């Protein structure tokens, strides 16, 4: 048969499946298009967590992991598991980049500043990585100051007190906590530089709220009505800021939410906001690569692996045209992560980024920029592209707020866009796969605490085939199977590096 054109991959970010309707935004929302597709089109479910996406068993997936696996067409071993194993086996302490960092700081008589996520969420960082790094550096005789980034998003919203207590009790002699900062301030990815400045002012200059210790900082924030994600940058004890000769080590192993704060702390020529005088760092280390720009002023403990013949690269190598579209919050995922960590577009790859709305939290505007995404998606479907990849951010980003009604509104807005896309694909004679990278908004109440659930889930996600071959069925699978499925629809062979299997069964 003639290959359909275009073939569209529509990713409903954070749209999981759960049988129970209670606090299930996906089930409770009015989504006539999604419901019709599930009732009339071939569909199945995908696994998005644990070893099926290269993570430790039981570890929930996330957008970076999901899009990396989708684009690779194979299970990609993720940094969380690799770092866990290095710590367990003792090779972390001998990591060449870490040893070089310690030597440089020691030679200058400086202090090592460690910034990391203080939770066991495992999406951007992990408290055990932070503790392990403190132990290694302190054992070398270098003083350590920790910049504790509280989570409340990939874990329960008010769990930071316990994690901070755990960290404080694990600290060896010569190590202390210098600041406590909610990730809202320190881990922005949408150029909200007013937030980032507040975080860097605390780390660089000791400016912000004050507290005697880290546990007291969390308690004071809660008394101010701030849950963990939003804890105002707080300076602990006698901490006064960073000095010339100090070193800085960022322990985040996911790039997107580390880039801005690191640029503010050390990027030469940085001018997005007034940083004040920055120290002459003796060493500036990252757990992973954050971008080619960051590589110019940072060293890396665990450089990224090269993923050859991703979906985008393979499609480009056959002289075909492709289009990527998302709003700001998920734009890196349909470009950088889907392309295996490559910044530069492939030949014939066009992109569009809709600007995410400038609101404090997305429950205030649950439609986000989905209408703009939908407009450009429908336009692209009619423009002769061979492959289109689109991400709707709403179910995930609004799901993270814990607001059920807003999450329902988010799903309804996405469903409207999905309806427009389905009709455009039908008119163009194309085909579409509708799926998600992980779950989120299908669970809005924590079953253990009864409070808001703001994290991702390990629930299965849907995969639906629209406009596929007559009589086709879909089997259950995992995210790595999506690229081979798209290639089959496009009539392209599968590169040998892709070990995923097409989900289409005749």
UniProtKB/Swiss-Prot annotation:
Signal peptide: none annotated. CDD domains: iPGM (cd16010). InterPro entries: Alkaline_phosphatase_core_sf (IPR017850), BPG-indep_PGM_N (IPR011258), Metalloenzyme (IPR006124), PGAM_B_sf (IPR036646), Pgm_bpd_ind (IPR005995). GO terms for cellular component: cytosol. Mn(2+) 2 binds at residues 13, 63, 437-438. It catalyses: (2R)-2-phosphoglycerate = (2R)-3-phosphoglycerate. Substrate binds at residues 124, 153-154, 183, 189, 254-257, 330. Keywords: Glycolysis, Isomerase, Manganese, Metal-binding. One of its GO terms (biological process) is glycolytic process. The keyword Isomerase applies. Its cofactor is Mn(2+). Transmembrane segments: none annotated. Pathway: Carbohydrate degradation; glycolysis; pyruvate from D-glyceraldehyde 3-phosphate: step 3/5. Mn(2+) 1 binds at residues 396, 400, 456. Binds 2 manganese ions per subunit. Its EC number is 5.4.2.12. Pfam families: iPGM_N, Metalloenzyme. The keyword Manganese applies. The active site is at residue 63. It is an enzyme of class 5 (isomerase). Belongs to the BPG-independent phosphoglycerate mutase family. NCBIfam families: pgm_bpd_ind. This is 2,3-bisphosphoglycerate-independent phosphoglycerate mutase. It comes from Cereibacter sphaeroides (strain ATCC 17025 / ATH 2.4.3). The lineage of its organism: Bacteria, Pseudomonadati, Pseudomonadota, Alphaproteobacteria, Rhodobacterales. The gene is gpmI.
């Amino acid at each position: 048969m003639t290959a359909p054109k275009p073939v569209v991959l529509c990713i409903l970010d954070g749209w999981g499946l759960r049988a129970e309707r209670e606090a299930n935004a996906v089930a409770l929302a009015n989504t006539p298009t999604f419901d019709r597709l599930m009732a009339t089109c071939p569909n199945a479910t995908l696994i998005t967590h644990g070893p099926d996406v290269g993570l430790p068993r039981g570890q929930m997936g996330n957008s970076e992991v999901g899009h990396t696996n989708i684009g690779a067409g194979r299970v990609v071993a993720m940094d969380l598991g690799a770092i866990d194993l290095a710590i367990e086996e003792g090779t972390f302490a001998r990591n060449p980049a870490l040893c070089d960092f310690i030597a440089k700081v020691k030679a200058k008589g400086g202090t090592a500043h460690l910034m990391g996520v203080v939770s066991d969420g495992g999406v951007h960082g992990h408290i055990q990585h932070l503790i392990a790094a403190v132990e290694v550096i302190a054992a070398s005789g270098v003083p350590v100051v920790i910049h504790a980034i509280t989570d409340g998003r990939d874990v329960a919203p008010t769990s930071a007190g316990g994690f901070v207590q755990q960290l404080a009790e694990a600290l060896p002699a010569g190590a202390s906590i210098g600041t406590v900062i909610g990730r809202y301030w320190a881990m922005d990815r949408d150029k909200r530089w007013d937030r980032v400045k507040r975080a860097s002012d605390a780390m660089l200059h000791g400016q912000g709220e004050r507290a005697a210790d880290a546990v007291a900082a969390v308690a004071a924030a809660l008394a101010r009505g701030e849950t963990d994600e939003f804890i105002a940058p707080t300076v602990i004890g006698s901490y006064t800021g960073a000095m010339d000769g100090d070193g800085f080590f960022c322990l985040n192993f996911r790039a997107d939410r580390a880039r801005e704060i690191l640029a503010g702390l050390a990027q030469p020529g940085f001018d997005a906001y007034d940083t004040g005088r920055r120290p002459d760092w003796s060493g500036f280390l990252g757990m992973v690569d954050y971008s080619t720009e960051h590589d110019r002023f940072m060293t890396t403990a665990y450089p990224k692996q090269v993923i050859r013949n991703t979906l985008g690269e393979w499609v480009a190598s056959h002289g075909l045209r492709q289009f990527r579209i998302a709003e700001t919050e998920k734009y890196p995922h349909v470009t950088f992560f889907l392309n295996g960590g490559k910044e530069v577009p492939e030949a014939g790859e066009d992109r569009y980024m809709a600007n995410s709305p400038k609101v404090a939290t997305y429950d205030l505007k649950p439609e986000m920029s989905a209408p703009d995404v939908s407009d450009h998606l429908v336009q692209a479907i009619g423009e002769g592209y061979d492959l289109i990849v689109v991400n709707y951010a709403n179910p995930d980003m609004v799901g993270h707020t814990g607001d059920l009604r807003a999450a329902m509104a988010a799903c309804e807005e996405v469903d409207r866009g999905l309806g427009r896309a389905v009709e455009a694909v039908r008119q163009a004679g194309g085909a579409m796969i509708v799926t998600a990278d992980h779950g989120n908004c299908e669970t809005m109440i924590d079953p253990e605490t009864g409070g808001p659930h703001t994290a991702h889930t390990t629930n299965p996600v849907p995969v639906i085939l629209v406009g596929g071959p007559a009589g086709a069925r879909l089997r259950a699978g995992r995210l790595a199977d999506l690229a081979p499925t798209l290639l089959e629809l496009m009539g392209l062979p599968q590169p040998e590096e892709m070990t995923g299997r097409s989900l289409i069964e005749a």
